């Protein structure tokens, strides 16, 4: 447990102790102490609504309860400078600022581990995200889903969850047949032969490239081959090509996966039949009008869903149910799916299936990724100027850089539409949040280098009584808030909470830098203490940027 968490725990215990001393409630009647961080700094470092929570038990007005808690509160034990009461009975706590300096050695010693919490307690969580069809380039929605999904995984891991990242390969549906047919057309074209493109065929540059490569490698070998054999080969060849491209693009985007799970394997291993049988055994499947139905309305869906159509073919739902059953059979406690906005209506039926299989209602969580709109020169941009086609993830990275894409996509709540300002993303000004954050890190590294050149090295065993200014305390309070930001981001599944935190930390750093001198030639002890504060800030900022997949440059 880090020093910031210790401070909060001691404060909570002292609030409980004050309640008992005041005779307001028995120990068993005291609710969990909730501490909020006020947005307005003039309202203290922490605030609690304990007085309102106790009103019914104590049979007194919240304001009177608050006064009695304050009267019996031990400020010394909790390192509190002062308390006050606001509104109907909120109690505001102002920390003893000198106590905050204990954070500096704590962060220096923790290093990369600073910010870790154990709210996850080793719970096994599987996060499935991106899962784009392997039939073309990743578009902006996939890119946002990749950035959000990866950041969420990083945050969950930092908060003590055992996380597995998974990509579901849609390699069994009709889209793969269309891929094979599209590759066939481009293969024939590469040999100077004509073949009509299917109506729903894929017309991307990558399909043309596959056709050319096939022609170069195999010549006209497939022209007179049996069509079924030719298409089977093209299906495998095209799928392998597209998957390699997807893996490479995601790797370049700093998005790793632990598992690439093939939909085809569900058919090969009989898992679809097993899932159907499991639902049937529990009485949630029935036959009607020649089709097989899932009684999903039992679990809150607005209508029952077809699993097997009259012609004997499966709907998308049945293999998806089998896939989710397989996830749970692998021992995960929680499933988190990061889906595009077009999947919103699909959520109730999947949650119904999880419940029908005998699992708790909240076992499956779905995070929806809303649409992205690009703006350049204040105007909405629909097509890439380079290709004349829809903008891909690769195009966007080339336009503004990898760090800007990762930061901007992690900056907003995933379930809100996003306007991505391309001009802002490349500007070298404080208005550009990624530049603002990275410049803060580079600025700290510059100060640390200057200190080293003068033989001043930060250390954990210094005299930190030299840390006394308001700007230093503000910076320390922000550093101390990092574990809390990680915990909240993990618990609420909101990785943008970390991005908000990064901005706050960068602001506190820039504000300190503009007001105070780090290295004072006349005072070596003070200089070393401030350099240690800078090192603690650098560690925290670097750790936070890592969570959202953004680099922390030492020079800019």
Swiss-Prot record:
One example of a Gene Ontology biological process annotation: arginyl-tRNA aminoacylation
Principal location class: cytoplasm
Motif mapping: 'HIGH' region: 132-142
InterPro entries, per the entry: aa-tRNA-synth_I_CS (IPR001412), Arg-tRNA-ligase (IPR001278), Arg-tRNA-synth_N (IPR005148), Arg-tRNA-synth_N_sf (IPR036695), ArgRS_core (IPR035684), DALR_anticod-bd (IPR008909), Rossmann-like_a/b/a_fold (IPR014729), tRNAsynth_Ia_anticodon-bd (IPR009080)
Subcellular location: Cytoplasm
Top-level taxon of the source organism: Bacteria
Reaction(s) catalysed by this chain's protein: tRNA(Arg) + L-arginine + ATP = L-arginyl-tRNA(Arg) + AMP + diphosphate
Keywords: Aminoacyl-tRNA synthetase, ATP-binding, Cytoplasm, Ligase, Nucleotide-binding, Protein biosynthesis
SMART domains: Arg_tRNA_synt_N, DALR_1
Enzyme class: ligase
One CC-aspect GO term: cytoplasm
A GO MF label: arginine-tRNA ligase activity
Record EC number: 6.1.1.19
Record Pfam families: Arg_tRNA_synt_N, DALR_1, tRNA-synt_1d
HAMAP family noted in UniProt: Arg_tRNA_synth
Subunit and partners: Monomer.
PANTHER family reported in the protein's UniProt record: ARGININE--TRNA LIGASE, CYTOPLASMIC, ARGINYL-TRNA SYNTHETASE
Family as reported in the entry's similarity comment: Belongs to the class-I aminoacyl-tRNA synthetase family.
Name of the protein this chain belongs to: Arginine--tRNA ligase
Originating organism: Bacillus subtilis (strain 168)
Gene name linked to the record: argS
